[in-house]
Structure formats: C-alpha cells, structure tokens
Amino acid sequence: MAKTLVFLGLLLATVMVHTAVASDPDLTTDFNVTNPVSEDFAFREFHNLQAPGKGVATPHFAQFNMKPPFVGLNGLGLAAVLFEFGPESQIDPHTHPRATEMFFVLSGEIQAGFVDTANNFFETTLYIGDIFVFPKGLLHFLRNNGKGTASGFSALSSENPGVLSVVKGLFTASGTGFPDIVISTALGINAKDSEIDGLKAAVAFKNNVTLNW
C-alpha cells in the first residue's frame, strides 16, 4: 500500500506540473476554498484501496473532487478518478477534449490504447504499478480482459476534462441526434432504419446498465 501511495503521489505531481501550461484559468488567490481548514486539503478515501474491486459487477468510477467533495482541488486545474472494473468489462472508446490523462494500475491487468490524429493505434497491457498516458483529446479506451476484478487511478490535467463517448455520441445524442443515413454511411453499411433503431436501442440499454461514463 505504501508503494502504491508513492506512485500516486508522483502521478499527481506530474500532472500538476503539466497544469502550468493547461487551459484552466489561473487562480488570483492561493486556493479556492471558503473558510478553509486543514482537512479541506486532505482526502482519505485511498484507505478503501486496500481491497480494490470488492463487490464490483460493472466498471465504475468516483471522481475524488466530487464524491465525496475534495474541496482542496477546487480551482487548481486537476481532476482525480478511481476506476473499478468487473471481469471482462471496459470503459468504451471516448475522449477528454480538455485534458491529458495519466492512468495508474492498482490491481489486476488492464488493456489500454489510443489512436492519434494520423490514425496510428497505440496499445499495451498494463500490470500493477504501470502507468499509461492518454494525450489530450485523443480517442482511447480501458479494458479488463481478466476473469477477476481490476482497479486503477487517473489524474487529469483539467478539473473539467469533459467526456465524449464515440458510441453514445453517435447513437444516443440528445435532441434529434445524427440522422440514420449519416450513421449508415459513416459505418459503410446499407442499413434500414429499423436496423439503426436496433443499434440505438442496444446502446441505450448498455448505457442504462453501466455507470456514468
């Protein structure tokens, strides 16, 4: 556990250096905490990492500066995320338009990959203690291919990194969404409206049974 916390400290420190050139606005005060006390700058939920993955059925995350609040991070240009993956589960391909992400494996084995703007694919399998970086705005994924649970921690270089899921954006966007002809043309298929509707329904159901990502 001590080694894990050292790695996490280094991870956060690295991302904090990156935020010096990030797009989040600079503070005009030392920090953004009303009536601060010492505990505002401490976060004690890492104690729960001694038994990562316990009882997890589907991948989920807890954003440290939101649930529970880590008010000491407010305005500092950082976000922190804890992931727990059920067996053979994944975080679907998505992007963070406003942040670079550094992912650290806490338990299990995680497949990680991204594609760059030249359509080159970079992928590897990560083990406990490994770190992988997802450059800002690039499409990426995380997957637990194992039969057991896995967990990891990410630090992002913006407190509001944004999340754009390819599948959710394509099939379940709010409002009118993408026209069926646009989707079928993009996928290179001669699909009837009913087939596209079936894909949309499948994605909508999947979004209902996974958690907030």
Regions found by a protein language model. Name each.
Residues K3-V81, I189, D193-W213:
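A short, N-terminal "cap"/entry segment at the start of jelly-roll beta-barrel domains
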Residues L78-V81, P87, E101, I128-D130, ...:
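Core residues of folded domains in eukaryotic genome-function proteins
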Residues F31, N120, T124, F141-W213:
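Double-stranded beta-helix
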Residues L73-G77, P97, K147:
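A generic fold-level signal
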Residues G86-Q90, H96-A118, I128:
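Glycine- and acidic-residue-biased ligand/ion/polar-headgroup-sensing regions
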Residues L73-G75, D116-G137:
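Short acidic-glycine-tyrosine-enriched beta hairpin
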Residues P69-G72, V81, D92-H94, E101, ...:
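Beta-strand elements of modular eukaryotic interaction domains
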Residues I91-H94, A112-F114, T124-T125, F134, ...:
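Short beta-strand His + acidic residue motifs that chelate non-heme Fe in jelly-roll/DSBH
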